[in-house]
């Protein structure tokens, strides 16, 4: 059994290494300078083709789906893509991947575990149901027509979507369009925009996940005729968790432009996708012209231009920081070495100076003994009157003793 387990582990490791060696751009069939939108479109097209739900009991399709998913995980994350482009596939491993799930394909037990992990803070990215995307691509979904300026409040089931179509005139398209969705219950949802394909089907082109802001969860798509940016806070959190000290420099990596900046006159399709784990999603959708918000649009353009400039400055600052930090580390190490060397030299000098003496070294124990003997003698013998000596005995009682009394001489005189 141990041998079988070892072979299985080696096989899994070999498959993972093979995935790493595959060029993700080649897997998705796109050039290395592809935009985020081109990467997403290629992934969705191939994921639909090789999805296990559409190819049951097909090991070749399952393997291709695994490769396509791995390639997308590398290229869809700005940090992972930069790592791959600069250092190669060996730098991109499982630790850099996000967990991305199609909740519609999970059983009840797996969904419970996914929800639990999400509650514990594990970043779980969810995808739009492959079956739903397939239906949209085949043109079998139902769309509800809306007018510009119309507001709709509804409830959509989990892993399902409501599709809406809006028709723009030339003037409305030129003015710009805003599509916003919010949920007062802070439900999770995705705001989707679809391109129309030749066969009358719909291909997912834009996706914006809801984000909690105050008492609401919101998402928005903006078509102003100039680049508008999105900011994924999850990418910043991952950068900080990987390297808290230098994660600051990657804070704006997730500040990326929307792939579509303007809409042409004609019909356009949006959708709201329920992204809760268990319950339906209550939401309010509004589609309106951006013409009344001319000042806000210019303010947004100016502010985002400053953020983009700051992102460029951060890249330069990061290079300078690493250079200065390396110099500081070297200087700190040198300083520690100098302090140790100085301490050793001073210690050696003190030892040499202590050797310059003509007196022999004394034993500390015998010196203390002699001192105590002298002190004890002085305490025992206390001088009094001539011929009288007070002797202090151990009991503390003093006895007088007389010496040198010439009794015999006194008798002779008498």
From Swiss-Prot:
Keywords recorded for this protein, A-Z: Chaperone, Coiled coil, Membrane
Disulfide bonds: none
Alphabetical list of PANTHER family matching this protein: CHAPERONE PROTEIN DNAJ 39 (PTHR44272:SF5), DNAJ DOMAIN (PROKARYOTIC HEAT SHOCK PROTEIN) (PTHR44272)
InterPro entries (UniProt xref): DnaJ_domain (IPR001623), DnaJ_domain_CS (IPR018253), J_dom_sf (IPR036869), Plant_DnaJ_domain (IPR052812)
KW Chaperone (keyword) present: yes
Record's function text: Plays a continuous role in plant development probably in the structural organization of compartments. Seems to be involved in early gravitropic signal transduction within the gravity-perceiving cells (statocytes).
Coiled-coil region(s): 296-324
Membrane topology, record value: Peripheral membrane protein
Residue ranges of every copy of the J domain listed in the record: 23-88
Organism field: Arabidopsis thaliana (Mouse-ear cress)
Location of region: Disordered: 1-36, 362-395
Annotated GO CC locations: membrane
Designated name of the protein: Chaperone protein dnaJ 39
Induction notes from the record: Up-regulated by mechanical and gravity stimulations.
Taxonomic superkingdom: Eukaryota
Bias kind Basic and acidic residues: ranges: 1-24, 382-395
Matches recorded under PROSITE patterns: DNAJ_1, DNAJ_2
Homology family: Belongs to the DnaJ family. C/III subfamily.
Location relative to the cell: Membrane
Pfam families: DnaJ
Expression by tissue: Expressed constitutively at low levels in seedlings, roots, leaves, stems, flowers and siliques.
């Amino acid at each position: 059994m141990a041998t079988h387990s070892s072979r299985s582990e080696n096989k899994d490791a070999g498959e993972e290494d093979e995935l790493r060696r595959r060029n993700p751009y080649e897997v998705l069939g796109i050039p290395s300078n592809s935009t985020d939108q081109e990467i997403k479109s290629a992934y969705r097209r191939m994921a639909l083709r090789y999805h296990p739900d559409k190819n049951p009991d097909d090991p070749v399709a399952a393997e291709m789906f695994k490769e396509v998913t791995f390639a997308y995980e590398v290229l869809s994350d700005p940090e992972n893509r930069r790592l791959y482009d600069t250092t190669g596939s060996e730098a991109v491993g499982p630790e850099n991947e996000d967990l991305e799930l199609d909740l519609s394909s999970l059983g009840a037990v797996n969904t419970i575990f996914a929800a639990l992990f999400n509650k514990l803070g594990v970043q779980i990215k969810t995808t739009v149901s492959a079956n739903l995307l397939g239906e949209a691509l085949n043109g079998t979904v139902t769309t509800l027509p809306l007018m510009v300026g119309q507001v709709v409040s509804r409830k959509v089931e989990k892993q399902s979507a409501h599709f809406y179509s809006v028709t723009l005139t030339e003037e409305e398209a030129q003015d710009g369009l805003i599509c916003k969705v919010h949920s007062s219950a802070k439900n999770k949802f995705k705001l989707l925009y679809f391109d129309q394909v030749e066969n009358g089907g719909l291909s997912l082109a834009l996706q914006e996940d809801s984000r909690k802001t105050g008492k609401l969860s919101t998402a928005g798509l903006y078509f102003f005729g100039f680049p508008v940016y999105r900011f994924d806070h999850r990418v910043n959190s991952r950068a900080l968790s990987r390297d808290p000290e230098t994660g600051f420099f990657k804070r704006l990596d997730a500040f990326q432009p929307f792939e579509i900046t303007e809409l042409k006159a004609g019909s356009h399709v949006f959708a709201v996708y329920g992204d809760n784990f268990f319950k339906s999603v209550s939401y309010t959708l509004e589609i309106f012209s951006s013409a009344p918000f001319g000042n806000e649009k210019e303010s947004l353009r100016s502010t985002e231009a400053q953020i983009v400039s700051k992102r460029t400055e951060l890249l330069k600052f990061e290079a300078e920081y690493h250079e200065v930090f390396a110099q500081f580390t070297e200087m700190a190490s040198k300083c520690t070495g100098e302090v140790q060397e100085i301490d050793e030299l001073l210690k050696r000098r003190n030892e040499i100076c202590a050797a310059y003496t003509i007196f022999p070294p004394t034993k500390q124990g015998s010196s203390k003994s002699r001192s105590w003997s002298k002190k004890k003698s002085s305490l025992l013998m206390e001088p009094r009157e001539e011929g009288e000596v007070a002797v202090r005995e151990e009991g503390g009682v003093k006895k007088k003793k007389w010496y040198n009394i010439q009794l015999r001489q006194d008798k002779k005189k008498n």
